[in-house]
Regions:
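A conserved beta-strand-loop-helix scaffold within acyl/acetyltransferase catalytic domains
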Residues: 45-70, 86-99
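Conserved beta-strand-loop-alpha-helix junction that forms the acyl-donor binding cleft
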Residues: 128, 141-154, 173
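Conserved acetyl-CoA-binding loop-helix of GNAT-fold acetyltransferases
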Residues: 117-132
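Conserved catalytic-core motifs of GNAT/GCN5-like acyltransferases
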Residues: 144-146, 163-176
């Protein structure tokens, strides 16, 4: 299942739209649901940082605006029935795909640190995402990925035992190994890519 936090940042926290099954990019089955047991400021800070860094680092590719960024809690088909955390943009020609299609949702992986080849996330943001998992809001938080080096980064992570090109991964009821391993994998990733 997919939960989208929609509209502007303030109302985004209050309204979620539920999409059942596989994402249909044109037809959304919207059922309202509220998160009442978690601090709104944590969500807000995550979204604000994503907007700030994407806009500053990728202005010519990115159409990110506060009213057009969606936070999604989603069903991950690759790993089974887990909920994860990603950011989405609904703008035509979104930053990640640079697509000109008019799909309702364009995939935008979390990108917080443009200086890193694998589009990693900052420690501060990783801590916020980890907090969402620890609080039980989501079972799994992921971030990172790549743009021009997408396949190379994915292959590098496969060699390190990751199933996909995630720079950051933290799961409910698991050790913090994947979170703490982030800094140690940077050099290995660059070596594998080279």
């Amino acid at each position: 299942m997919y939960y989208f936090l929609t509209q502007d940042l303030e109302s985004a926290f209050k309204l979620t739209c539920l999409v059942k099954g596989t994402v249909d990019r044109t037809n959304f089955n919207c059922n309202c649901s509220l998160y009442k047991d978690y601090d709104f400021d944590v969500f807000l800070n995550v979204i604000k940082e994503a907007i700030k860094n994407n806009t500053e680092a990728n202005g010519k590719f990115c159409n990110l605006k506060s009213g057009k960024v969606y936070l999604a809690v989603f069903y991950d088909d690759d790993v089974g029935q887990e909920r994860g955390l990603l950011l989405f943009s609904i703008e035509e020609g979104s930053w990640f795909s640079n697509s000109k299609s008019k799909s309702a949702v364009e995939h935008l992986q979390v990108r917080f640190d443009s200086s890193r080849l694998s589009a990693g996330i900052s420690r501060a943001t990783a801590g916020l995402l980890r907090g969402l998992v620890d609080a039980g809001v989501v079972d799994r938080a992921i971030g990172g990925g790549s743009t021009s080096y997408q396949e190379e980064v994915k292959n590098a992570y496969l060699k390190l035992g990751f199933n996909m090109s995630y720079e950051f991964c933290y799961e409910k009821n698991s050790s913090s190994a994947c979170y703490e391993k982030q800094a140690d994998t940077d050099k290995q990733l660059e070596e594998n890519i080279e």
